[in-house]
């Protein structure tokens, strides 16, 4: 204010903890305001470049009935329709979850939802075009999504239990990457080369910025 700013200012409490304290919840509410899909992600790593900081880079889906019930009740109480995406952080000071915001859309890292078996396009078409009555789908099984090489996840995630879970899911084929669509890569040398260079660049970026 000493520099002449006169408008209101919001001061937000800083929640301690590294990337793995973050959670992301994506939901779909039908045209009647009823939640029909919920997928909670445990963020493992975020991007750390100056321009990309905060974007999710690796996620494991998880099930937390208490947390998901609270969000379901909230969305239905305001008769919300469409996609919703919540940024959440676990606060070790009082062992509670703190909600930063609700995005009125699917998130940038939304392929963690699709990859785990929840096709968001299908929900929209069946609800809005075909007017079907949808069943509630809550993602319960763990699934590993990433947009960076596995080696980066294994190196920079500090919680070894989470790293071991990633390795187990990868070995079981319960894993997806946003750049791993086989129909894009099959016979497409240029695209495959681009993904290879992208992966090398991600390794370089994390080594430089993620300390």
Annotate each language-model stretch with its function.
Residues 87, 112-114, 136-137:
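Short acidic alpha-helical/loop segments enriched in Asp/Glu that coordinate divalent cations
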Residues 13-79, 103-128:
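ATP-dependent carboxylate/phosphate-activation module, predominantly the ATP-grasp catalytic core
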Residues 2-18:
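ATP-grasp fold ATP-binding core
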Residues 12-13, 81-93:
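A short glycine-rich, hydrophobically flanked beta-strand micro-motif that places a catalytic Asp/Glu
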Residues 95-105:
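A short beta-strand motif that forms the metal-chelation/ATP-contact edge
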Residues 33, 94-95:
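Glycine-biased flexible loop/turn sites that connect beta-strands or occur in inter-domain linkers
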Residues 126-211:
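Peripheral (often C-terminal) accessory segments that flank ATP-dependent C-N-forming ligase machineries
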